[in-house]
C-alpha cells in the first residue's frame, strides 16, 4: 500500500508541472514560442511584448501584470489563465480560447479578439477601448465596469453575460446576441432568447 501511495504521489508531482522548461526559457529570451506548452507556467510581470505565441498552450498560466502588448496569441489556449492587470494593448488574440480566464483590470485597448472564446471569463474593470470583439463568445462572461468605448462587438454572443456599469459609448453591437444579459443599467435583456 505504501508503494502505491508513493507511486501516486510521484506521478501527481510530475504531472502538476505541465509546461516544458525549455519552452519557458525560449519565450523569456527570444519572445517566440509557436505551439509550445506553457500551461501552468509562472510568467508573472514577464516582458512578452511583441512575442509570437501563435497556438501556444498557456492554460492556467500565471500572467498577472505581464506585458503582452502587441503579442501574437492567435489560436492560443488560455483557459483559466490569470491575466489580472496584464498589458494586452494591440495584442492579436483572434480565435484564442480564454474560457474562465481572469482578465480583471487588463489593458486590452485595440486588442484583436475576433472570434475569440471568452466563455465565463472575468473581464471586470478591463480597458477594451477600440477592441475588435466581432463574433466573440462572451457567454456568461463578466464585463462589469469595463471600458468598452468604441469596441466592435458585432455578431458577438453575450448570452448570460454581465455588463453592469460597463461603458458602451460608441460601441458597435450590430447583431450581437443578448439573452439573459445584464445590461450596464442593471436591467436584464431577453431580446434574443
Predicted segments with their positions:
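Positively charged n-region of N-terminal signal peptides that target proteins for export
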Residues: 1-5
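Tandem repeat scaffolds
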Residues: 19-193
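N-terminal signal peptide c-region/cleavage motif recognized by signal peptidases
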Residues: 13-15
Amino acid at each position: 500500500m505504501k508503494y502505491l501511495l508513493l507511486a501516486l504521489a510521484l506521478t501527481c508531482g510530475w504531472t502538476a508541472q505541465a509546461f516544458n522548461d525549455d519552452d519557458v526559457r525560449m519565450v523569456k529570451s527570444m519572445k517566440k514560442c509557436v505551439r509550445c506548452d506553457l500551461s501552468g507556467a509562472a510568467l508573472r510581470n514577464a516582458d512578452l511584448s511583441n512575442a509570437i505565441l501563435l497556438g501556444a498552450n498557456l492554460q492556467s498560466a500565471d500572467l498577472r501584470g505581464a506585458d503582452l502588448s502587441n503579442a501574437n496569441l492567435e489560436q492560443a489556449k488560455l483557459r483559466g489563465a490569470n491575466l489580472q492587470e496584464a498589458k494586452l494593448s494591440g495584442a492579436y488574440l483572434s480565435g484564442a480560447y480564454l474560457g474562465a480566464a481572469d482578465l480583471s483590470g487588463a489593458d486590452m485597448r485595440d486588442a484583436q479578439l475576433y472570434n475569440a472564446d471568452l466563455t465565463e471569463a472575468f473581464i471586470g474593470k478591463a480597458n477594451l477601448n477600440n477592441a475588435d470583439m466581432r463574433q466573440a463568445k462572451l457567454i456568461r462572461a463578466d464585463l462589469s465596469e469595463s471600458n468598452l468605448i468604441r469596441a466592435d462587438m458585432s455578431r458577438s454572443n453575450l448570452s448570460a453575460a454581465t455588463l453592469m456599469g460597463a461603458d458602451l459609448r460608441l460601441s458597435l453591437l450590430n447583431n450581437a446576441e443578448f439573452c439573459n444579459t445584464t445590461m450596464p443599467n442593471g436591467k436584464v435583456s431577453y431580446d434574443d432568447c
